[in-house]
C-alpha cells in the first residue's frame, strides 16, 4: 500500500507537469511518448532504494568535544534508566493498542483496494468478451494483409481492436473510406499497446484520479495522431471534418 501511495503521488505530480508544460503542444507523437514515459517512471521511482550511510562518532569523542565529565554522564544515564523502567508498562500497552489499530486499518484498506482492482478486472474481461462476441456475430473481410474488417448490421460505433476494424453497415456505405483510414491509423501506430499498458496500470491505481486522467490524455493524443495520418493519406478534409462533427453530436 505504501508503494501504491508513493506511485499515486508521482502520477499526480507528473500529470500536473504534463498539463502545464505539454498540454497545449501539437507534437502528438512526442506527447504520446512523454505520457507513456511518465507513467512508467511513476511506477519505477517508488521502488528505488537510496542507501544512506551514517557514521556515528564514538561516545568518548563526544564527551571530549563537549567536555562533559564521565561520572556526570553516568549519573544522568542511571536517572534516565530509572525513568524508562517506570514507564515501560504504559508504553508497551500504548504501543500494542496502536499496533492493533494500525493492523486493522491496513487490513480494511487492503481489502478495499483489492476489491476495487477485482471489479475493474472483471469489467475488462466482460468488455473483451463483448468484443469477441461482436466480432464472431459479424461479417468479416480481409483487408491489407492481416487487417480484418468487421461489418455489423446494427448501428455500432466504429473502433479498432488489435488487427480488427469494427464498423456498422451504414457507416461502411456512407463514410467507409474515412472511417477505415482513421481506424487503420490506430492499428499502424500501435495505439492498442499504449491503451493496454494504461489499463494494466489502472488496475493498480484505480483509486487515483491522475491515472484516469493519464489514460484520457493518451486517448486524446491517439485521436489527434490518427486524424493527422488520415489527412496525410489524402482523405478530403472537409468531408472528414463533417464526419467528425456527425460522430461527435451523435447524428
What are these regions (language model features)?
Residues 1-68, 96-251:
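Membrane-embedded and juxtamembrane structural elements of multi-pass membrane proteins
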Residues 68-99:
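Low-complexity, acidic polar-rich segments
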Amino acid at each position: 500500500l505504501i508503494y501504491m501511495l508513493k506511485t499515486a503521488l508521482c502520477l499526480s505530480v507528473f500529470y500536473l507537469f504534463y498539463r502545464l508544460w505539454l498540454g497545449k503542444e501539437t507534437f502528438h507523437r512526442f506527447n504520446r511518448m512523454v505520457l507513456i514515459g511518465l507513467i512508467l517512471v511513476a511506477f519505477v521511482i517508488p521502488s528505488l532504494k537510496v542507501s544512506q550511510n551514517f557514521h556515528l562518532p564514538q561516545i568518548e569523542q563526544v564527551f571530549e568535544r563537549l567536555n562533559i565529565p564521565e561520572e556526570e554522564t553516568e549519573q544522568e544515564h542511571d536517572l534516565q534508566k530509572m525513568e524508562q523502567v517506570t514507564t515501560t508498562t504504559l508504553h508497551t500497552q500504548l504501543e500494542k493498542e496502536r499496533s492493533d489499530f494500525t493492523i486493522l486499518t491496513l487490513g480494511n484498506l487492503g481489502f478495499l483496494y483489492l476489491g476495487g482492482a477485482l471489479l475493474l478486472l472483471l469489467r475488462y474481461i466482460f468488455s473483451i468478451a463483448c468484443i469477441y462476441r461482436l466480432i464472431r456475430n459479424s461479417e468479416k473481410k480481409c483487408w491489407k494483409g492481416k487487417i480484418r474488417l468487421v461489418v455489423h448490421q446494427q448501428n455500432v460505433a466504429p473502433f479498432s481492436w488489435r488487427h480488427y476494424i469494427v464498423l456498422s453497415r451504414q457507416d461502411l456505405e456512407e463514410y467507409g473510406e474515412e472511417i477505415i483510414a482513421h481506424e487503420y491509423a490506430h492499428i499502424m501506430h500501435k495505439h492498442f499497446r499504449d491503451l493496454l499498458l494504461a489499463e494494466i496500470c489502472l488496475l493498480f491505481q484505480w483509486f487515483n484520479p491522475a491515472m484516469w486522467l493519464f489514460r484520457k490524455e493518451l486517448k486524446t493524443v491517439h485521436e489527434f495522431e490518427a486524424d493527422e495520418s488520415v489527412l496525410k493519406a489524402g482523405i478530403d478534409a472537409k468531408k472528414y471534418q463533417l464526419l467528425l462533427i456527425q460522430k461527435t453530436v451523435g447524428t
